[in-house]
Amino acid sequence: LNELLQRIKRPGHRHYDAYLVLDADNILDPNFISEIEKVYSAGYEIVTCYRNSKNYGDNWISAGYALWFLREAQYLNNARMRLGSSCAVSGTGFLFSDEVLRECGGWNFFLLTEDIEFTIDNVVRGHKVGYAAGAVLYDEQPTSFAQSWRQRMRWSKGYLQVFRKYASRLFSGIAHGSFSCYDMTMNIMPAAVLTGTSIVVNVGAAIANATNGGSMAALGLSVLQTVLSLYMTLFVLGVITTVTEWRSIRCTGGKKVLYAFTFPVFMLTYVPIC
């Protein structure tokens, strides 16, 4: 992307007010450009879209990705937009102005999750990312677990890289009252830290239980309750998103219902990845 933008901005080439980033296999709703432009014209220098998927019904893996991105669009970015906070760029289907590009000194985002890096870099600069709910993009999701594992492993490493690079500036923004900085910090907080904390707490509880003469059956029941609680929490999130975005999901009704049940399993596979 950096090389392309440098070529576009060579002397003698046309000047562009903004740039739209898309993957070659993305399919756009007929009104995509006009909907993105509405938000851009409202004053947002960076705009992201409603990220849908064209292969939701392939299997539980593609559906897991797709449902997460629908939830991200409707219940994270849409909520942020309503609250006046900054939204977050996710993968593809986003616009940024030439002014933003100049402020950044070009596209200098080379971490494993450059979309998140770009978002955080602009949030700490004081920019807000807008969300165009009517700009619908259809993306293709992985269908094999091996491919999904490698991709999400890369994302997890990328989150760590971004957190390491921007943590101090995010915390400084939080100290100065920036809700967007707080929100983005929670968005990129390394899952490994949260998972590690959970493991330490549970191991500590197991040791305490054994020391005090507690039964292993009680410990096993406690672990089972924790897993079921996590499953039900994720299941509810998946069901709510499935119901509200029902008409946007491109697959049969039976698969929509089935994949609401497999969504928690997909999300729980993040634990060993992180």
Predicted regions and their residues:
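Short aromatic/hydrophobic "clamp" motif used to bind/position activated sugar donors
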Residues: Y19
